[in-house]
From Swiss-Prot:
Protein name per the record: DNA topoisomerase 1 beta
Residue ranges, compositional bias (Basic and acidic residues): 102-116, 134-149, 177-187, 256-265, 296-307
Organism: Arabidopsis thaliana
Phylogenetic lineage: Eukaryota, Viridiplantae, Streptophyta, Embryophyta, Tracheophyta
Site annotation Interaction with DNA: residues: 464, 512, 561, 593, 650, 676, 718, 775, 793
Location (main, coarse): nucleus
C-alpha cells in the first residue's frame, strides 16, 4: 500500500504538487457475510379438508415455488384437486399407489406435495395430525426418513423402487411433450431445492432454502481467491451442477438425484443457480451476473508473471479436460464476457473517481447498493510545533503555532519554481498576513528569511533517510495499523477497498501552469466540513477527533460516494471519497464506458455524414455545431466550459477564441491554446475545405478575444450529441478515437519478433493515442542523465566487441588472447564461444539503443493517462494473448487490479467489431 501520509488533492486545472500514490498495493480481500439467515417456513395449521381445497394456492407461495415450475401448473393442480379424495395415511396406500390408475397416482402425488417438499407420506400418524404442522420442515424430513426406512422390504431398494415407479407414472391421453412437462412438475421439490442449494454447500451441512448469499463472487481483483469466513465451499467455477442430497434428507428423494444425468437436467440445474438471487427470488436469466463478469483466473503461485496469458490459458484448458462432469472455467468466463459485450449491465452510471465536481452528486434513481458500511475518513495528524524561528530584517521572530505551520509550508518550497513566482508569493502573503494580524512586526514578505526553517526541514529529511530498515518497517506497520479500518467498506455484504480514504492535509495550492490561485492557503479540513453517506442499518462512523461531529449523515443508495466536502480553494467544487478503481462498481462503470464507445462505431458513419451536410447550412448555429462536432471527432478536443475570473483560463472546443485558431491557406488550421491542466495545445492540421471556409466566416468581423463559436455553448453541443446517439458526449468521442487508434495500429504494426520489440510497437501506438488526446508532460530533470548513462554503457559494449573480435582472430590462428584492459589475463575461449559472446553483446547494444530512442521519443508524452482512462483495456489484453506478450510488461500492478474485468477477453477481440445497437 502507499506509504505517503497524504492523498493528492485533485482539482480541475490544477494540483497541489503531491505525487500520485499507488492505492492498490494490497490485494483485495472479498468476504461473504457470515451472518446468513436460515429461515424455516412454518405452515399454519389447517384441517385435511381445507388442505385438499387449497393445494393450488399453497404450491404457488413464493418460499415453496421451484424455478422449474411451469406457468400452467397452478391451474392444472387446482383442477385436479377438485377431483381428488383425501389420501389414506396407511402404509399400504404407499405401496398400492404405484399399481393404481393415473387418477389414483394423481392423488398420491398431491398428497406428497401437500406434505412439503414432495416427501412421501409417513407410515403411521398420530390422531392429532395437525400437531405436526408446528414442527419445522427439517424435523419432519428427518422423521419421515426414519419412518420410511422402517417399512417392510426385502432389501434397501424398496423405497427406491417406489419413488422411481411414482416418478415414471404418466397420465393417459397426453402428448409426449405434455407428459414430459407434467413429469417435470411432479418432480419432488426437495430434489430441486437440493440442486439449487447444494452448490457451494457442504454435504454434511443442512440445506437452508433462503440462505442469503451475496451475488458478487469473493474474487480478488488481482486474480487471487481470498479466504472465506465460515465453512469452506467449492470453487464456483468447479462445482458440479448436481450432487447427492444431504445426509439429513429423506432417502426417498435419493433415487431422483441418483438417476443418470441428462442434458435437460444439467440445463435446469444451471438455470436454477444462475437465476436465483440471494433471497431465492427469480432473476432475469438474460441479465449476466456482475460477479462472474470480473472473475480472474486463480493463480497457484506468484512465480508465473513472466508467462504470457495465452500460454497460461492453454495450460488451464488442458487441466480442465481432466473432469468431464465439471464445466470449463475458462469457457464460462469467456461466455459471460461475450454476454457482457452484447448487453452491458446498467448497474452504475456514476463513473467519477476521486475527482472534483461543481455540483452535488445526484443519483439517476437506480439503486446502486442495498447495504453500505464503512468507517469514514482518516484525518492528517495535528501540527507539531518545531520552534524554529524565521528572520525578519535579520532578527528572529516568534510565531504562534498556526503562523509557524503556514510559514513552514512556504519555507520547504524554497528549491521549487513556485517559490519565486510573483503570483505564488502574492497569494501566500495575502493569506499569511491575515494570520499575522494588523499589528504584527512582519510587514513585508521580501524582508523575511525562511532559511532557518528550511535547514531544519532538510535535517529532518536526512534523519529519515538514515533510519534503519527495521525502524522504517516499524513506522510503516504503525501507519498501516492506524489506517487499516479506513481502507475497507462492506458493500452488499462484500468487502471492497476504498480509494482515497485520507483527507488532504493543509498546504499551499500550486496548480498547473499559471493558475491564478497558486500560493493560496488550503485550510485544514475538519469533521464539521464532511458529509457521510452510509446505509441506514449501518453504525454511523465514529468521529476520530474528540469533541467534533460530522456535518451531515445521509443514506442515499442511488449514489456511490462515501463522503464529500467542499474544496478549500474552490468552494463551488466538491471532493468525494469513492471505492477504489479495482472495486466491482468502478469496474462495471469502466466496462459501460468502453461499451458505449464501441457502440459509437455503429453510428459514426451517419454522424459524420450529418455534420458534413451541415457545413453549408444557412443557419449559423447549426453550421457552428457541425464544425465543432467535426473538430471534436477529428482532433479529440474537449467540449470546454465557461470559466470564472478566479479560475485557470483553459480552453475547449466551444470556448475557443478567434486568436486561438489561425487559417493557413489553402486548408490548414493552426490551433494554439491552453488545454486542460493548463497544458499548451499547439497543432497544425489539414481540414476539409468547407471547414476551413466556415472557420474564416466565423472569424470575420471579430477581435482576437471574441468567441469563435459565438452562437454555441457546451449545453447546446451536448444536447445535439445526445440526439445523434444516446449518451454521446465529447468524452465518448475521445474514448472511441483513442481505442480505435490503438486497435488499428497494433493490428497493423505488430510483427514477429522478441517480446521487447513487441513492447516497443505497443509504446509507439500508445504514443500516437497520447498525441491525439494531447497528453503531454514536462521533460524530467533526470532525463538527460539517464540518456547519458545509456550512451556510456553502449560505448563500453562497443569497446568490448572490438576486443572480442581481436580475440576471435587470434583464436582462429591458435594464439592465446591478449591481456585485458584491466591488466588481467583473459580466458582462452574457442572461436565458437567467442562468436556467441559477440552476438550476445551486440544484442545488448541493440536493446540499449532501442531503450534510449524510446526515452527520447516519450520524454514529452504522458502515456499513462490514455492507458488509464481512454484506451479499452481489452484491446491490450487480447493483443498480449495473440502475440505471447506477458500482460505485466504493459500493465503495472494497479492497472492489473483496475482492469481485472478485462483479463478473460477472447484473444480475437477487436474494438471495431460490431456491437449491439
Amino acid at each position: 500500500m502507499a506509504t505517503e501520509a497524504f492523498v493528492k488533492p485533485v482539482v480541475p486545472n490544477g494540483h497541489d504538487g503531491y505525487e500520485d500514490e499507488d492505492e492498490d498495493d494490497i490485494p483485495l480481500v472479498f468476504k461473504r457475510n457470515s451472518n446468513t439467515a436460515a429461515t424455516t417456513n412454518r405452515p399454519s395449521p389447517i384441517n385435511n379438508a381445507m388442505r385438499n381445497s387449497a393445494i393450488g394456492s399453497t404450491k404457488s407461495s413464493p418460499p415453496m415455488r421451484s424455478p422449474l415450475t411451469s406457468p400452467n401448473r397452478s391451474a392444472s393442480s387446482s383442477t385436479r384437486s377438485s377431483m381428488m379424495k383425501p389420501a389414506l395415511p396407511s402404509s399400504s396406500s404407499v405401496q398400492r399407489s404405484t399399481l393404481k390408475s393415473p387418477l389414483r397416482d394423481d392423488r398420491s402425488v398431491v398428497a406428497k406435495e401437500r406434505n412439503g417438499f414432495g416427501k412421501a407420506p409417513s407410515v403411521s400418524k398420530s390422531d392429532d395430525e395437525d400437531s405436526e404442522d408446528d414442527k419445522p420442515l427439517s424435523a419432519r424430513l428427518k422423521l419421515d426418513s426414519k419412518e420410511v426406512t422402517k417399512q417392510p422390504s426385502s432389501s434397501g431398494r424398496g423405497s427406491t423402487q417406489q419413488a422411481v415407479q411414482k416418478s415414471n407414472m404418466r397420465p393417459q391421453g397426453l402428448s409426449d411433450y405434455t407428459k414430459k412437462k407434467v413429469l417435470d412438475e411432479r418432480a419432488p421439490m426437495s430434489s430441486t431445492v437440493q440442486t439449487k442449494t447444494s452448490v457451494g454447500t457442504s454435504s454434511s451441512k443442512p440445506v437452508h432454502i433462503e440462505q442469503k448469499r451475496p451475488l458478487v463472487n469473493n474474487i480478488d481483483r488481482n486474480g487471487l481467491k481470498p479466504k472465506t469466513e465460515g465453512h469452506s465451499s467449492q470453487a464456483p467455477a468447479k462445482r458440479p451442477l448436481e450432487k447427492g442430497s444431504s445426509s439429513n434428507q429423506s432417502s426417498v428423494k435419493r433415487p431422483k438425484l441418483s438417476e443418470p444425468a441428462r442434458p435437460v437436467k444439467v440445463e435446469q440445474g444451471s438455470h436454477i443457480s444462475a437465476t436465483q438471487d440471494a433471497k431465492g427470488k427469480n432473476l432475469d436469466a438474460s441479465k449476466p451476473l456482475r460477479a462472474n463478469q470480473a472473475t480472474v483466473k486463480e493463480d497457484n503461485s506468484d512465480g508465473d508473471d513472466h508467462v504470457p496469458i495465452a500460454s497460461r490459458m492453454k495450460s488451464d484448458s488442458s487441466n480442465n479436460k481432466s473432469s468431464s462432469a465439471k464445466p470449463s472455467s475458462s469457457k464460462m468466463i469467456a461466455s459471460s464476457s461475450r454476454t457482457i459485450a452484447q448487453k452491458p449491465n446498467k448497474w452504475v452510471k456514476d463513473s467519477k473517481y476521486s475527482k472534483s465536481s461543481k455540483s452535488l452528486p445526484s443519483g439517476d434513481g437506480q439503486k446502486k447498493w442495498k447495504t453500505l458500511q464503512h468507517n469514514g475518513v482518516i484525518f492528517p495528524p495535528p501540527y507539531k510545533r518545531h520552534g524554529v524561528k524565521i528572520l525578519f530584517q535579520g532578527k528572529p521572530v516568534d510565531l504562534t503555532p498556526e503562523q509557524e505551520e503556514v510559514a513552514t509550508m512556504f519555507a520547504v518550497m524554497r528549491e521549487t519554481e513556485y517559490y519565486k513566482k510573483p503570483k505564488f508569493r502574492e497569494n501566500f502573503w495575502n493569506d499569511w498576513r491575515k494570520l499575522l494580524g494588523k499589528n504584527h512586526m512582519i510587514k513585508s514578505l521580501d524582508d523575511c528569511d525562511f532559511t532557518p526553517i528550511y535547514e531544519w526541514y532538510m535535517q529532518e529529511k536526512e534523519t529519515k533517510k538514515q533510519m534503519t530498515a527495521e525502524e522504517k518497517r516499524i513506522v510503516k506497520e504503525e501507519k498501516l495499523k492506524q489506517e487499516e479500518k479506513y481502507m475497507w467498506a462492506v458493500l452488499d455484504g462484500v468487502r471492497e477497498r476504498i480509494g482515497n480514504f485520507r483527507v488532504e492535509p493543509p498546504g499551499l495550492f500550486r496548480g498547473r501552469g499559471e493558475h491564478p490561485k497558486m500560493g493560496k492557503l488550503k485550510k485544514r479540513i475538519r469533521p464539521c466540513d464532511i458529509t457521510i453517506n452510509i446505509g441506514k442499518e449501518a453504525p454511523i462512523p465514529e468521529c476520530p477527533i474528540p469533541g467534533e461531529r460530522w456535518k451531515e449523515v445521509k443514506h442515499d443508495n442511488t449514489v456511490t460516494w462515501l463522503a464529500f466536502w467542499s474544496d478549500p480553494i474552490n468552494p463551488k467544487e466538491f471532493k468525494y471519497v469513492f471505492l477504489a478503481a479495482s472495486s466491482s462498481l468502478k469496474g462495471q462503470s469502466d466496462k459501460e464506458k468502453y461499451e458505449k464507445a464501441r457502440k459509437l462505431h455503429n453510428h459514426i458513419g451517419s454522424i459524420r455524414a450529418a455534420y458534413t451536410k451541415d457545413f453549408n447550412n444557412k443557419d449559423v448555429t447549426k453550421r457552428q455545431i457541425a464544425v465543432a462536432t467535426y473538430l471534436i471527432d477529428k482532433l479529440a478536443l474537449r467540449a470546454g466550459n465557461e470559466k470564472d475570473d478566479d479560475e485557470a483560463d483553459t480552453v475547449g472546443c466551444c470556448t475557443l477564441k478567434v486568436g486561438n485558431v489561425e487559417c493557413i491557406p489553402p486548408n490548414k488550421l493552426k490551433f494554439d491554446f491552453l488545454g486542460k491542466d493548463s497544458i499548451q495545445y499547439v497543432n497544425t492540421v489539414e481540414v476539409e475545405p468547407l471547414v476551413y471556409k466556415a472557420i474564416g466566416q466565423f472569424q470575420a468581423g471579430k477581435s482576437k478575444t471574441d468567441d469563435l463559436f459565438d452562437e454555441l455553448d457546451t449545453s447546446k453541443l451536448n444536447t445535439h450529441l445526445k440526439e445523434l446517439m444516446a449518451g454521446l458526449t465529447a468524452k465518448v468521442f475521445r474514448t472511441y478515437n483513442a481505442s480505435i487508434t490503438l486497435d488499428l495500429m497494433l493490428s497493423k504494426e505488430t510483427r514477429d519478433g522478441d517480446v521487447p520489440e513487441k513492447v516497443v510497437v505497443y509504446q509507439q501506438a500508445n504514443k500516437e493515442v497520447a498525441i491525439i488526446c494531447n497528453h503531454q508532460r514536462t521533460v524530467s530533470k533526470s532525463h538527460g542523465a539517464q540518456v547519458e548513462k545509456l550512451a556510456v554503457k553502449i560505448e563500453e559494449l562497443r569497446e568490448q566487441i572490438k576486443e572480442l573480435n581481436i580475440d576471435l582472430d587470434r583464436a582462429k590462428k591458435g594464439r592465446t588472447p591478449l591481456m585485458g584492459s584491466d591488466g588481467k589475463r583473459k580466458r582462452n575461449l574457442t572461436p565458437e564461444a567467442l562468436e556467441k559472446k559477440i552476438m550476445q553483446t551486440q544484442g545488448k547494444i541493440e536493446k540499449m539503443e532501442r531503450d534510449m530512442q524510446t526515452k527520447e521519443d516519450m520524454k514529452t508524452v504522458a502515456l499513462g493517462t490514455s492507458k488509464i482512462n481512454y484506451m479499452d483495456p481489452r484491446i491490450t489484453v487480447a493483443w498480449c494473448k495473440r502475440h505471447d506478450v506477458p500482460i505485466e510488461k504493459i500493465f503495472n500492478k494497479s492497472l492489473l487490479a483496475k482492469f481485472a474485468w478485462a483479463m478473460d477477453v477472447d484473444p480475437e477481440f477487436r474494438f471495431c467489431s460490431s456491437t449491439d445497437e
